[in-house]
Amino acid sequence: KNYFYLAALSLAMTFSMGACSDNNDPNPDGGGKDPVNLDYSSENASAWGNYMYNVAMLLNDDATMLYNSWVTDYVDEQGSHGPYATIFKDQTAGAYQSPLSCIEEMIESGMWNIANEVGDAKIKDPYTKYTSGDKEGGLYAVESWYSWHSRDDYTNNIFSIRNTYYGRIDDNDVSKVDGNLSAFNSYKDFDDEGDIAEHSLSKLIASTNPALDEEIKTLIFASAKAIQAIPQPFRNNIDSEESVAAMNTCMELANLLLNEVKPYVNQTFGDPEYDDDLDAIAEQFVDAVVLPTYKDLQEKNKLLLDAVNQFRQNPSNDNFEKACNLWITAREPWEKSEAFLIGPVANLG
């Protein structure tokens, strides 16, 4: 009956159940006791394990359904069937009537949407509440505050923008962050050769407006770097100067994407002569960014489910730690998919 994993698990379950319930009390009573001092019993242990398993099972089901919707079959609003990857790349149904409409979706519904959310909601909402005097409200407004993983989650959100813009997934970005992102002066130091695909938004924009491409790449990296500069954990440093700097940089990126990049792409590449180029970018985006991310999501959430089930059946410190580590691992593709919350993930809720 080791205290470490029992106390940690009881805290995790208390906060998770509080967040998922309709109870607005930020301090649920956990059955009449302080969360740290919950009584251990075989009944409690079984309930906690079952709760973890059901949450992991739902995550696994969602990840599987999402991946299958892109690669196997998806029913759109008009009742058309087919893999969503085909619908997007070939503009066979729904909102995509041209290659340009796909690129617009990538910019506004994808990249702008998450840049704006990180700056204007994920950082600004807690900051506004906290600095207005509602410190408890500010704390509870922090996404992922109970796992102390907010800062890395937000960084991965920005990396999802980078992957979309570059048309390729960076396979070592997280490891470079772990080595200290402040060590890199700019995206030029951070990027590896070949990170930017030939058929990408970056290459297309650079071919006609290299200064704009430079500004986009600079702000993407600056946003990630500013987020990583927030003292860890974010929940304990909501009102820091670094938090304000990160919020402002992300909003600057969002404004650039919506107010300059999207109009520029429409005006410059709206002629049908660019359709083949835009088609190639859409295909590269789906095949090299979306599908690998969702495949990774499916695989990692299956591993998480297996680990949680193993812990449920054989409670131990080692099995608990394995489940915790796999939960953190499974978070990465979730967060890195947020620059393409389009199609099935939006329509299926």
List each model region and its residues:
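C-terminal motif of bacterial Sec signal peptides marking the signal peptidase cleavage site
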Residues: 15-19
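Hydrophobic helical h-region of N-terminal Sec-dependent signal peptides
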Residues: 8-13
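Bacterial N-terminal signal peptides that target proteins for export
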Residues: 1-7
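Mature extracytoplasmic or organellar-lumen-exposed domains after removal of signal/transit peptides
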Residues: 22-349
